[in-house]
Amino acid sequence: MMPLLSQLTTAKNGLEDAQITLCGAVTAHAEAKRILERAEAYLLCEGVEGKNDKERGAKLRLELTAAYYGLHEAEDALTEARCVHELARLEWDLARYRCKAEEMYSTEAV
């Protein structure tokens, strides 16, 4: 088992890395959403052909396939980053509680 200080350092570094990754995923998701919205607005201004709203909606969706794919990829990355961040936060909490327990145990033993 790792010494407590090493556990704290490792957990803190892991949490910092997870926070950086999460911030990047949030930014990438927002950018993918903006790209989709801009592309959709552009196509709507240009006009989408079709007999009715349903057909025009389907054609619009087909035209925006790449943008939707980018958004779904960004959503998946964001979900993963959130999970990794939560795990890192739990590991950090566990390391802190272990140190606190060790401190309490050491105080009682004296």
Residue locations for each model-derived region?
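Extended alpha-helical coiled-coil "stalk/arm" regions
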Residues: 25-61
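Terminal low-complexity, poorly structured segments
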Residues: 1-4, 32, 39, 56-60, ...
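Long amphipathic alpha-helical coiled-coil segments
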Residues: 21-22, 26-35, 69-104
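Extended, low-aromatic, Leu/Ala- and acidic/polar-enriched alpha-helical coiled-coil segments
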Residues: 12, 61, 65-76
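Short acidic DE-rich linear segments
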Residues: 105-110
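Short, charge-rich amphipathic alpha-helices with coiled-coil/heptad character
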Residues: 1-20
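Generic detector of low-complexity/intrinsically disordered segments
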Residues: 7, 45, 62-66
